[in-house]
Amino acid sequence: MSPQELKNVLQSGLLSFPLTDFDRELNFAPKPYAERLKWLQPYGASALFAAGGTGEFFSLEPGEYSDVIKVALDTCRGRTPIIAGAGGGTRVAIQYAQEAERLGAQGVLLLPHYLTEASQEGLIAHVQAVCRSVRFGVTVYNRGACKLTPASLLVLAETCPNLIGFKDGIGDIETFVSIRQTLGERFAYLGGLPTAEVFAGAYKAMGCPVYSSAVFNFIPKTAMEFYNAHAAGDSATCDRLIRDFFLPYIALRNKNHGYAVSIVKAGATLIGHGAGPVRPPLSDLKPAEVAELAALMAKLGPQ
């Protein structure tokens, strides 16, 4: 898939990022992971980010990363494009991106670098190095320590032809509007705030109609119902789901640091497609919190 073809894929439909399955000893569990992908396929996500943030990329060893991407590609080949996560320091991110390309992934999501703050010059050099190390399409994730400005993205757009996507996980309205107006149609724009459904309407108004859904992992029917309503301008359905499910869900998610991943794994277990525990430093939901989530999910009906 060429970078331009990947850009076209990312400009419509619901995107998601599958959980990574671990066993009780916290080892990667390839068979349940493949079964998860098979279960999700009929719901119709336009692309999946394998080994992304919700897939606990940050906890994977290099060998495990290769296994995760390979299972995703083998399971979804010919049906759902697989975009691999890549991140860390520049040389490490290059290694992940090149491995994903070698395995046959359709593109890569460049996750924020680790720990240290960086200047705009440093961020530009980092993204350029990763883009120049591969031929397939790259989407950069503006989040955490990676806060690219409109001017920096303009430089990257001119120097990295395979940089085709911009995912926003910061939520600064002024900055995003400036980026969207400065770069125009050069990128595919993705909403990437946690529990993106709550912000989908605002992002659509700013010229970003596409987002990635974490809840697709455990309430895929509802996730697609929300996306279809969002795409059709059915604000009544979107408002109902935000009010009845997503806002209480966010309140539960915010009870502890790292729960943005943990709550999704808890939901997958409740729906009958468990992905095992999260790896440290994340922690699983407490029993009472799981019960709260179960009550919320029950209101949505069968998935």
Swiss-Prot record:
Keyword Lyase listed: yes
Catalysed reaction, written as an equation: 5-dehydro-4-deoxy-D-glucarate + H(+) = 2,5-dioxopentanoate + CO2 + H2O
SMART domains cross-referenced by the UniProt entry: DHDPS
Enzyme Commission code: 4.2.1.41
UniProt-listed InterPro entries: Aldolase_TIM, DapA-like, Dehydro-deoxyglucarate_dehyd
Keywords, alphabetical: Lyase
Pathway: Carbohydrate acid metabolism; D-glucarate degradation; 2,5-dioxopentanoate from D-glucarate: step 2/2
Record GO terms (molecular function): 4-hydroxy-tetrahydrodipicolinate synthase activity; 5-dehydro-4-deoxyglucarate dehydratase activity
GO process terms (BP): D-glucarate catabolic process
Pfam families, per database record: DHDPS
PANTHER family: 5-DEHYDRO-4-DEOXYGLUCARATE DEHYDRATASE 2-RELATED, DIHYDRODIPICOLINATE SYNTHASE
Family the UniProt entry places it in: Belongs to the DapA family.
Protein name (database record): Probable 5-dehydro-4-deoxyglucarate dehydratase
